[in-house]
Amino acid sequence: MADAESTRRSRITPERQAELHEAVLDLLREVGYEALTMDAVAARTKSSKATLYRQWGSKPELVARALRCTQPVSLREIDTGSLRGDFEVMVEGSDDDQMAKDTALIRGLAHAVHASPELHKALRDLLVDPEITGLQTMLQRAVDRGEVAPDCPALDFVPHMLIGAFIALPLIEDRPVDRAFLRQFIDAVVFPALGV
């Protein structure tokens, strides 16, 4: 299955793929998920609908992969030797402008996720689950190094804390998350909860 999927996706250069993803994100910002069509993406990118469907299979998958390409670094790959260092690399690898754009997109997709099980599954499979797995890997290394107690009850809730911050800040303070806020949140909430 993975070979068929990679063969299906190998016909477009990485540069063209990035161009298509950016066009999808631009259209999402302009019209929202519900009004986004493969016809509009094809017109914007001067490609055929057949190419889009061959490459991505569905609108939900295309949207999820476009969002995934905005992630600056895979959390699984971060390993500085300390949890503080790992979180600092995670924050430094983030871009304030991109986080502001992503916050607006996520806010716009919140309703669509509840209305579209296919979008919900695509976002979980391609965006949320890989990030949570990477974060859990990072946290497990901290446990293995003795930085966090293996029975720390907060370990299971770190993804919830971080995702919650991205949702709550725009709602409460009407501003997107930025690196300064993330550092402050991690130092004031995440590390104390982990006993670090």
Task: Spell out what each predicted region is.
Residues 92-99, 106-115, 186-190:
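Helix-loop "lid/cap" segments that line or gate small-molecule binding pockets
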Residues 1-44, 50, 61:
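Basic, helix-initiating cap at the start of DNA-binding domains
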Residues 96-108, 118-145:
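Amphipathic alpha-helical packing segments from all-alpha helical-bundle domains
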Residues 20, 35, 58-63, 73-74, ...:
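Short amphipathic alpha-helical segment with a characteristic S/N-K-E followed by hydrophobic residues
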Residues 75-104:
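Hydrophobic alpha-helical connector segments
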Residues 121, 125, 129, 143-188:
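Hydrophobic/aromatic-rich alpha-helical bundle segments in the mid-to-C-terminal region
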Residues 1-7, 89, 96, 133, ...:
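C-terminal peripheral helix-coil segments that are non-catalytic and often amphipathic
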